Each structure stands twice: as C-alpha cells, then as structure tokens.
Amino acid sequence: MMKRQELMELEDEKLIWACVEPVIQKVRGRSGLEKLQVFRKLGDGQRALFMFQVLHGHMEHGINGFYDQVSYLAEQMNIWSALKSGMRYLGFDAMIDLIGKMEDDYARKADGRADNAAAEELDDIYRNLIPSAIRGVADRIRSHPEDFLPGED
C-alpha cells in the first residue's frame, strides 16, 4: 500500500481509485449479500466514496449502460437511496438531483416506457457535472483523509 503522502500527491482520479480500490477488490465477484455486508461495514466516508465510484465507474457507457450494470444492486439494496446518501455526504446537491431524475427514468424504463430523449439529457447533465465532482471528491479526500483512506483489516 502507498504511503499517505504519495496518495495525496496523485492526480484526482488516481487518488479516488487508490482509496476505493481495496473495497472494490473485496466485493468483486461476490454475491449480492456479501457485497451488502462489506458495504455496511464501511465508514461513512468510504461508503460515500464507494457509491461515487459505483456511479462514475458504471456511467462509463452512458445512462443505459449504468442501468444495465446496477440492476443487480437494486435487488439487494436501495441503490438510489445509497447513491443519494453518498452524494449528500460529499456535498453534491446537483448530483443528488441528477440521481433522482435517473431513478425516475429507470422506473419508466422498467415499466416499458423508455424515453431516449430523457436518457440523452441525463447523459449530458452527468458529463457536465462529473469533472467538478471528481475535483470535489479528491479535494475532500485531501482535506479529510482519515474518512476515506483504506484502513488496515
């Protein structure tokens, strides 16, 4: 594991990944119940960071790709509530609003009422918000490293 000072000097996205990767390694390939157990053991900061990475990592292929990837989480936990809670902890009100709109769009899609224009708009909003969100998360990690840095098991 890197030393704290080395972590703090990383570029923003690399810093976020270095802090969240140990959690991702713990849940990768596990059952939904096992993932939920790991999630519940995290501190508030680590939980928020994990949810940020769930959003950011799964949005790589757009909103519909995100929906496809997280549908399994919706079965095990209230993914929408967890995402909003994470963004609230990180202080990203605009992301909370976006997640609420995503939740509504996801429900419409699940009911067979997909709205491609709405999905494209949500993609655009996300792309506009994510650069400042990444900076904000990295700044928060640097300001309060004890809340986010991986601990020893």
Question: What are these regions, as identified by a protein language model?
Answer:
Residues 1-79, 86-153:
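Extended, alpha-helix-rich binding/interface surfaces that flank or overlap catalytic cores
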